[in-house]
């Protein structure tokens, strides 16, 4: 089936997508409201409604980076133009120094060609419908690939097994000076991560090609065309011999899109099963799913330390966590001076006490065996778990009873300390 894409829609969504990838907002709806309100205000000030114009950053060019700085990354020409790096999240720090990159005005009167591509529903695909693709690599190649991928935002939320599948599936592509890696208007076939080399970004405007930026030994491009079935928005040309790591379209969508969809669905079910979150509305629980991250700890690894400032709240997804506490000024029975006061298993949570009382951590937590936890930062905790706060505060009485039984005192876990 061929679907006619309204003029300007692709550019609008691409610009919004990159803004989300750059800023990682905890509240996506609020961020979208602010983003599109800003666009509308900019258009009103200019006296025209150019919905294809994203006034601060260009989605296919990634975050503006370099801007004349000698650091490696993506650099954009002073005159803003349309480009196709489609990513560049890893250049976000450079973007803060270089300033925002202004996007070009898209001609909304030019009719957009229809886009016909396969539909992809991650829920309909069987788990093993596709055989796993493995491109053998030497230890040196794998190390270089891991280094090149470590700051790519698309891979940030993949667990170790998923990341291993991505690394296995990626293939090395050597390029010569002057070679076109992708061409504007072509269908997207691969996602690319730069290992080494310099590349220019060219965009045709009114039939004339212009260089709008470049990559210097770092960066990635090509994911938006794969995610949204849109043609390439620019041409990427090698300006020196170099090497890229490629990930094919099918593997990209299967691993990145499908696994993210599966993980969201799994976390939705898990969050819904937690009794202390029952007081949240469905929409509030979905917001929790959006902001939680996964952390894996090895046997004996410390998760939180007594006395540290609180920055996260944890829910045990799998494994067991030991909670220990040191009595003030007195060594207890264990060699490390701490006594075990509780254990947490799947569905139980810890780390909330310091967030509720605004005090340093009252206890330490260590992994028993391999432990996987869902973690939520303090800002999201305060914003999203307000309805659950009374339940958590009621637990303080239970904690105090445990401490009195163990130490003969409640350890002042509630009263403010200096």
From Swiss-Prot:
GO molecular function, one term: cAMP binding
Residue numbers binding 3',5'-cyclic AMP 1: 154-275
Protein name in UniProt: cAMP-dependent protein kinase type II-beta regulatory subunit
Residues modified to Phosphothreonine: 69
PTM notes: Phosphorylated by the activated catalytic chain.
Family annotation (InterPro entries): cAMP-dep_PK_reg_su-like, cAMP_dep_PK_reg_su, cAMP_dep_PK_reg_su_I/II_a/b, cNMP-bd_CS, cNMP-bd_dom, cNMP-bd_dom_sf, RmlC-like_jellyroll
Compartment list: Cytoplasm; Cell membrane
Pfam families, sorted: cNMP_binding, RIIa
Ligand binding (3',5'-cyclic AMP 2): 276-418
GO cellular component, one term: plasma membrane
Region listing for Disordered, in residue ranges: 45-98
Compositionally biased intervals (Acidic residues): 86-96
Originating organism: Bos taurus
Phosphoserine: residues bearing it: 83, 85, 114
Entry function: Regulatory subunit of the cAMP-dependent protein kinases involved in cAMP signaling in cells. Type II regulatory chains mediate membrane association by binding to anchoring proteins, including the MAP2 kinase.
Subunit structure and binding partners: The inactive form of the enzyme is composed of two regulatory chains and two catalytic chains. Activation by cAMP produces two active catalytic monomers and a regulatory dimer that binds four cAMP molecules. Interacts with PRKACA and PRKACB. Interacts with the phosphorylated form of PJA2. Forms a complex composed of PRKAR2B, GSK3B and GSKIP through GSKIP interaction; facilitates PKA-induced phosphorylation and regulates GSK3B activity.
Free-text tissue specificity from the UniProt record: Four types of regulatory chains are found: I-alpha, I-beta, II-alpha, and II-beta. Their expression varies among tissues and is in some cases constitutive and in others inducible.
């Amino acid at each position: 089936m061929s679907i006619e894409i309204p003029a300007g829609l692709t550019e609008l969504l691409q610009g919004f997508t990159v803004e989300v990838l750059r800023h990682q907002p905890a509240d996506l709806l609020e961020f979208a409201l602010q983003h599109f309100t800003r666009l509308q205000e900019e258009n009103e000030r200019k006296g025209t409604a150019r919905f294809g114009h994203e006034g601060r950053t260009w989605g296919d060019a990634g975050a503006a980076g370099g801007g004349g700085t000698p650091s490696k990354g993506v650099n954009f020409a002073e005159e803003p133009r349309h480009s196709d790096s489609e990513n560049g999240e890893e250049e976000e720090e450079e973007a803060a120094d270089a300033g925002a990159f202004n996007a070009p005005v898209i001609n909304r009167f030019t009719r957009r060609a229809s886009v016909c591509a396969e539909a992809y529903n991650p829920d309909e695909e069987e788990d093993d419908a596709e055989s796993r693709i493995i491109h053998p690599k030497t230890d040196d190649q794998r190390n270089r690939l891991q280094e090149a991928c470590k700051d790519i935002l698309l891979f940030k939320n993949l667990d170790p097994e998923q990341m291993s599948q991505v690394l296995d599936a990626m293939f090395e592509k050597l390029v010569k000076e002057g070679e076109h890696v992708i061409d504007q208007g072509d269908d997207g076939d691969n996602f690319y991560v730069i290992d080494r080399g310099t590349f220019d970004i060219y965009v045709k405007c009114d039939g004339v090609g212009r260089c709008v930026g470049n990559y210097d030994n770092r960066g990635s491009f090509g994911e938006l065309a794969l995610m949204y079935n849109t043609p390439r928005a620019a041409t990427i040309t090698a300006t020196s011999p170099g090497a890229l790591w490629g990930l094919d379209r099918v593997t990209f969508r299967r691993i990145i899109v499908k696994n993210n969809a599966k993980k969201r669905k799994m976390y939705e079910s898990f969050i819904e099963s937690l009794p202390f979150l029952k007081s949240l509305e469905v929409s509030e629980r979905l917001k929790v799913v959006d902001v939680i991250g996964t952390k894996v700890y090895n046997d004996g690894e410390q998760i939180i330390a007594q006395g540290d400032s609180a920055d996260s709240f944890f829910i045990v997804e799998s494994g067991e966590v030991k909670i220990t506490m040191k009595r003030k000024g007195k060594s207890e029975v264990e060699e490390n001076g701490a006594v075990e006061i509780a254990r947490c298993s799947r569905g139980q949570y810890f780390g909330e006490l310091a967030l509720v009382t605004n005090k340093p951590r009252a206890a330490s937590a260590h992994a028993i065996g391999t432990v996987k936890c869902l973690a939520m930062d303090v800002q999201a905790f305060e914003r999203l778990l307000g309805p659950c706060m009374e339940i958590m505060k009621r637990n303080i009485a239970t904690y105090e009873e445990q401490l009195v039984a163990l130490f003969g005192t409640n350890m002042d876990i509630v009263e403010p300390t200096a």
